[in-house]
Design a protein with these regions (language model features):
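Membrane-interface capping segments at transmembrane-helix boundaries
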Residues: 23-29, 186-197
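Extracytosolic (periplasmic/ER-lumenal) interhelical loops and adjacent juxtamembrane/interface segments
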Residues: 54-100, 152-170, 174, 178
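Residue-level signature of transmembrane alpha-helical entry/exit and packing/kink sites
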Residues: 10-11, 35-39, 100-103, 124, ...
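Interfacial segments of alpha-helical transmembrane regions
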Residues: 28-44, 117-134, 197-204
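Transmembrane alpha-helix/helix-exit interface in multi-pass inner-membrane proteins
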Residues: 47-60, 133-151
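Membrane-interface helix-loop junction between the first two transmembrane segments
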Residues: 22-37, 53-64
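Hydrophobic cores of alpha-helical transmembrane segments in multi-pass inner/ER membrane proteins
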Residues: 11-21, 105-114, 168-187
Length: 205
């Protein structure tokens, strides 16, 4: 049992929230709370849509004799599918190609929202990370509510397929996404420089 992400370089993503936080603290982000709210609404809604796609896909792959393809069946199958690495070893090759393109399209949609929401690249990057973080957290929360998976944060998941499959325990993307969202919020806060005390008139006499 490995506790960290694979391939090894995926673990470097844990540095992202800390790096962007210190970068943004040098010059706070110029993103309004209203922008973050609506970008967050999009991300949460999109996260549920993403989870729904996975639910439908599992249901379709689980349509076998004795299985009705219902939500209850999907919930029953979810754990065993991941424990057996079903999504990598037995996933139909034709659907794997579609899934890879779908992942790329997902990133393009999140990037497009960020590009349209801000004019400066640093603010666009912040909106992208904010949207991605909320999308990712909502994705796992929606799967948990609808299918009962993940049963714990230690469950193994396939995060992405581009350029190669990324695998990690669920706690890894949830933690990184949570810290990234926090970094964006803190990155909006203005710096408060220490002001030198002003001498009183009596001291100047």
């Amino acid at each position: 049992m490995h506790w960290w992400a694979d391939p090894w370089w995926v673990n470097l993503l844990a540095l992202v929230p800390f790096l962007v936080f210190f970068y943004w603290r040098r010059k706070p982000l110029e993103i309004s709370g209203k922008l973050l709210f609506f970008a967050g609404c999009f991300a949460v809604a999109f996260g549920f849509v993403e989870a729904s796609v996975v639910v439908y896909l599992r249901g379709a792959l689980g349509v076998l004799p004795g299985i009705g393809g219902t939500l209850a069946d999907v919930a029953r199958l979810s754990s065993s599918l991941y424990q057996q690495s079903y999504t990598l070893d037995q996933f139909p090759k034709s659907l794997m190609a579609v899934e890879t393109v779908r992942e790329a399209a997902t990133m393009l949609m999140l990037a497009s929202v960020a590009f349209l929401s801000a004019s400066r690249w640093r603010d666009r990057w912040a909106v992208f990370l904010w949207s991605f973080a909320l999308w990712d957290i909502t994705y796992y929360a929606s799967l948990r509510i609808t299918t009962g998976w993940p049963m714990s944060l230690n469950d193994l998941d396939v995060l992405f397929l581009i350029p190669v499959p990324w695998t990690a325990r669920v706690w890894f993307p949830v933690l990184v996404s949570g810290l990234t969202a926090l970094a964006v919020v803190l990155g909006r806060m203005p710096n408060l420089p220490m002001e030198a005390p002003v001498a009183s008139e009596s001291q100047n006499l």
